[in-house]
Amino acid sequence: MTDRIKVNAMDNDETKWPSWTAQGATTYAEAGVDTAEGARAVDAIKDAVHRTYRDEVRGDIGGFGGLFSINVAKNMADPILVSGTDGVGTKIQLARLAGKHDTVGIDLVAMCVNDILATGAEPLFFLDYIAIGKLKSEAVAEIVSGIADGCQMSGAALIGGEMAEHPGVMDPNEYDLSGFCVGVVDRPEMLDPAKVQEGDVLIGLASSGIHSNGYSLVRKVVTDGKTLYELRMPQESLGGQSVLDALLEPTRIYVKPVRSVLRQLPGAVRSLAHITGGGITENLNRALPENMDAELHVGTWSMPPVIPFVCRAAHLDEHEALKTFNMGLGMVLVVDPSKVDQVMDILEAEGETPTVVGRIIPGSGEVAYVDQEKLFADNPSAEE
């Protein structure tokens, strides 16, 4: 019966291809997808991609899959692959407003590689996904240039990606970013909250600003309703930066200084926390065992002025601020107390300004703040 229907349909002149095309075909380009512009975008990013390549990269742009040699792990006793994926969130809206698209590429890489660094992993390679309303090769090239910068900072090779044009779903100037990275760590050298002991020392690494979390709140209380002129005016309370520049400061990438410590002093770092969404309160506890607390001494570190600036605008108290933003600490290391001085020396040699911010005490896997009321003590503008 099925075969008869097919034959009869083909015998009907109204169902043949010529009659369909006579009615006028709709091309992919007419539907809003410009494959020619896509090809131009690929050409525009080639140099940026190539500058991230490592010796282990196999193949080149244009293949169906990114290739990377596993020989990188040949000297490891028990190599473990570590993967991470993340995005930049609504910080992209500020990049669009400013017409500046490279820094969010750095943010994208930072969010992924800093996460896998929490296991002690060395980032190996990175892939990106760009969804955009209307493909513009110049904007894509700027975004990918930032991604390549982030890859170079972290040592990850950019071995693949996707540019997806979404006409009718996204506005022409709208875009979103996602990233995916893979790293490797030798199992005996993995960082693990289970290794944390009473008396271990907390060393904080400074953030550059808000990083890439909390921007829905930031936009609501700081930028919504403001003109572009206002947002580009230098602000004394931001050290002379404009609001836009301060908010678009890219997320710091901690891979090279932390990996330097891990290579030179195996076992000195027990675990570490990447301070992202949820602030210090909801991230530092992820680096703890269930029977230990992190005693954090508030006021022992400084914070970029944009953080109290935003907290003031949102009328956040200390408790809420600490569970929303990084408050000046982008990463916290849990360190063997006998190795603190050596760890500090290595970090300083790598250009960091590490600070001892607390210690590990018996508890229940929580963050315990000492002198919480001092959070904004050196930043009176936050309390205005």
List where the protein language model places each region:
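Glycine-/charge-enriched secondary-structure boundary and capping motifs
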Residues: 3-5, 14-18, 23-30, 47, ...
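Acidic/polar, glycine-rich intrinsically disordered N-terminal extensions of enzymes
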Residues: 20-53, 57
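A generic structural signal for residues located within well-ordered alpha-helices
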Residues: 33, 37, 104, 213, ...
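Residue-level signature of catalytic and energy-coupling elements of molecular machines
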Residues: 34, 86, 199, 274, ...
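Glycine-rich phosphate/pyrophosphate-binding loop regions near the starts of catalytic domains
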Residues: 44-208
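Acidic-glycine-rich active-site phosphate/pyrophosphate-binding loop
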Residues: 79-81, 87-89, 193, 232, ...
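Short, acidic (Asp/Glu-rich) active-site segment that either coordinates a divalent metal cofactor
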Residues: 85, 176, 189-239, 243-244, ...
